[in-house]
Amino acid sequence: AEYVHAGKFFFRAGDWSGLLEAVRRDRGKSINGEHQEEFVKWSSECPPEKLAQDLDAILVMMRKLFSFRQIPEMLRLHGILMERLKSDRSLNEEDRNNYRGECELVMSFLKYNDISAMSELHRSACSLMNRVSRSIDPKGTWTFGSPSVAMMFHRIAGMLDHENREMHECMPYYYQIVDYHGNG
């Protein structure tokens, strides 16, 4: 909660670096529905050149924007991140690939609740990354408020056994890049 308060003060002061640091450190854990309007304002009013300086914060913001169904703003941040990766030669190839992979992970949520489609992006992330995600807290919630994992991905009547097999096939790729988040 202290990161939310810090973010509010950084925003009021126009201290974008401080705001982005608070977002990055919190990993979005303290930001919930009551902060949605304010959080979207932080994202939309932060200058793109400041956002581009903190790729980890962009990834956290993208994930929270997805949760808040603010997809156009999420995609705007995705564009800023991808442009920075394309144009900034100060990033080495390893870092560039880790950020690309983490971006694939966050973008996979746009495929929710199709586990196979999500897994395509998780597999891509696995091939790019040599570290675990920094934008997802492995101790954080996993089910988007759903009472069960089966309920999250069960989409077609009569297909639960097939969907369960899909989960067992697909989830190891997700676990690999998120330090086993959700493997409970």
Q: How would you name each of these model-derived features?
A:
Residues 1-68, 73, 77-80:
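Extended alpha-helical scaffolding segments used for macromolecular assembly and cargo binding
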Residues 49-184:
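Internal alpha-solenoid helical repeat scaffolds
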